[in-house]
Amino acid sequence: MILSIESSCDDSSLALTRIKDAKLIAHFKISQEKHHSSYGGVVPELASRLHAENLPLLLERIKISLNKDFSKIKAIAITNQPGLSVTLIEGLMMAKALSLSLNLPLILEDHLRGHVYSLFINEKQTCMPLSALLVSGGHSLILEARDYEDIKIVATSLDDSFGESFDKVSKMLDLGYPGGPIVEKLALDYAHQNEPLMFPIPLKNSQNLAFSFSGLKNAVRLEVEKNAPNLNEAIKQKISYHFQSAAIEHLIQQTKRYFKIKRPKIFGIVGGASQNLALRKAFENLCDEFDCKLVLAPLEFCNDNAAMIGRSSLEAYQQKRFVPLEKANISPRTLLKSFE
């Protein structure tokens, strides 16, 4: 088995993945959302301190799963990029300690690659090559994945990410953090689902294959300010619905532009924000239009987790892509560094 560790942001997670068939044997996670909610976003120093508390607790649960028999573990895998430096280092320190004490090889794994492999948790075979949309609080990307070694970014956001824009709109409406599920719920409750959108679709007339949410976010801000004296529940529902609809339509329009160029046969949606059900439905329709197979990460593995890191690290294990302890470092700003 591979013991994998994820600590790139505000989720502490450990998992055990069986090497022979890619089955997830154990997966434990502690979310920090309640600790960061009062701040309206992730506080790096607080996240780091909580990882230092939570990772050892999760390791104890792993020990119980193993009946304290660590001989079943053949490698340690750790997310080392990208992410918050102060949280990545907490996971790396644990991984190094385990690698040294158990005399096991160390695998450094890319967080974004892990999200792609969330599509294949509990599955030995992948369906690569494929293209994928990764939407989260930190990223909005279109990726092309040929195999483990060859995953490249073909489109990214010029400013805010999809998930980040939901958090900021939620803050404008005084709804709480994290904003994604709250805004989605209000949008679902809005009574007039078929009325014309009140917000502009970003980059609608641009030929640039990219994402942008800053203009949409500013349009929401102006609408909130206009309604500030009477910002009741009905108005919050309306703004949430029109914002979410415009944001998803932007993803659809840009992805459709990509589809017309590349005509992918398989398309995946991954990342924490891919839990949004309206987004999933919109991409089902898009893929039907282009006769493209849609693959979705299971809802429980959309957010950051060690299970996806364990699944992706199986490929590295088979290829013996191990890293000496003295060369094992974090790289917070690196996105899908190419293999040499």
From Swiss-Prot:
InterPro entries: ATPase_NBD, Gcp-like_dom, KAE1/TsaD, Peptidase_M22_CS, TsaD
Cellular component, GO, one term: cytoplasm
UniProt-listed GO biological process terms: tRNA threonylcarbamoyladenosine modification
The keyword Acyltransferase appears for this protein: yes
This protein's UniProt keywords: Acyltransferase, Cytoplasm, Iron, Metal-binding, Transferase, tRNA processing
Domain of life according to the entry: Bacteria
Amino acids binding substrate: 134-138, 167, 180, 276
GO molecular function: iron ion binding; N(6)-L-threonylcarbamoyladenine synthase activity
Subcellular location: Cytoplasm
UniProt signal peptide: none
EC number of the protein: 2.3.1.234
Binding-site residues for Fe cation, renumbered to this chain: 111, 115, 304
Swiss-Prot/TrEMBL cofactor(s): Fe(2+)
Cofactor binding note: Binds 1 Fe(2+) ion per subunit.
Catalysed reactions, semicolon-separated: L-threonylcarbamoyladenylate + adenosine(37) in tRNA = N(6)-L-threonylcarbamoyladenosine(37) in tRNA + AMP + H(+)
Function: Required for the formation of a threonylcarbamoyl group on adenosine at position 37 (t(6)A37) in tRNAs that read codons beginning with adenine. Is involved in the transfer of the threonylcarbamoyl moiety of threonylcarbamoyl-AMP (TC-AMP) to the N6 group of A37, together with TsaE and TsaB. TsaD likely plays a direct catalytic role in this reaction.
Annotated family: Belongs to the KAE1 / TsaD family.
Name this polypeptide is given: tRNA N6-adenosine threonylcarbamoyltransferase
Taxonomic lineage from the root: Bacteria, Pseudomonadati, Campylobacterota, Epsilonproteobacteria, Campylobacterales
Gene that this polypeptide is encoded by: tsaD
